[in-house]
């Protein structure tokens, strides 16, 4: 029986997976590699940093980063993207979840770059998951390019508006394949 702990958030879960046999693995989200619980209250309540499982203390984030960049095939990408409408996130009972899909790969690349482990990103993002599930590797390719861009504050479609992860931030990696397609970026 193969067991995957989806979207781990603690150093305890990292240790548990490391100590388990080869049939145990875990996914790690881009946002849990970038934020800790302080992001929820930075200058006030930040509903767009609220997700479940909730981001934990900084030492847990550090442990997740070390697991992700380790090259250990028991840890692999799991975005857990949650595109809740802005009005539902910014309400008195806001929805949990972070909309990371538009910049997930760029966010992972930023983390791996900061940790000096870009050579291990492909395994984490593209190989370890399929191999764990005994699935063929995808034939497609995505090229990440070191190129700065500013993530839009919101992504809108008609009356629907969603705030993406890294909204308003300038990132230093970009999926080259997306350069011509619509995504939440501002090149100004």
Task: Show which residues each predicted segment covers.
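Active-site-adjacent C-terminal substructures of enzyme catalytic domains
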Residues: 2-120
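Mid-to-C-terminal alpha-helical segments outside catalytic/metal-binding sites
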Residues: 105-188
């Amino acid at each position: 029986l193969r067991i995957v702990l989806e979207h781990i958030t603690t150093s305890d879960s990292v240790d548990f997976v490391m100590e388990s046999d080869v049939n145990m693995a875990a996914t790690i989200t881009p946002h849990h590699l970038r934020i800790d619980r302080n992001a929820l209250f930075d200058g006030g309540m930040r509903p767009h940093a609220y997700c479940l499982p909730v981001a934990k203390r900084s030492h847990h984030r550090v442990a997740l980063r070390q697991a992700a960049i380790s090259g250990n095939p028991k840890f692999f990408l799991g975005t857990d993207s949650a595109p809740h409408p802005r009005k539902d996130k910014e309400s008195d009972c806001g929805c949990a979840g972070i909309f990371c899909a538009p910049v997930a790969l760029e966010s992972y690349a930023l983390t791996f770059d900061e940790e000096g482990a870009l050579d291990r990103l492909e395994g984490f993002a593209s190989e370890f998951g399929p191999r764990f599930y005994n699935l063929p590797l995808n034939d497609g390719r995505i090229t990440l390019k070191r190129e700065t861009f500013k993530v839009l504050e919101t992504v809108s479609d008609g009356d629907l508006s969603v705030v993406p992860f890294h909204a308003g931030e300038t990132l230093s990696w970009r999926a080259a394949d997306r350069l011509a397609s619509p995504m939440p970026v501002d090149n100004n």
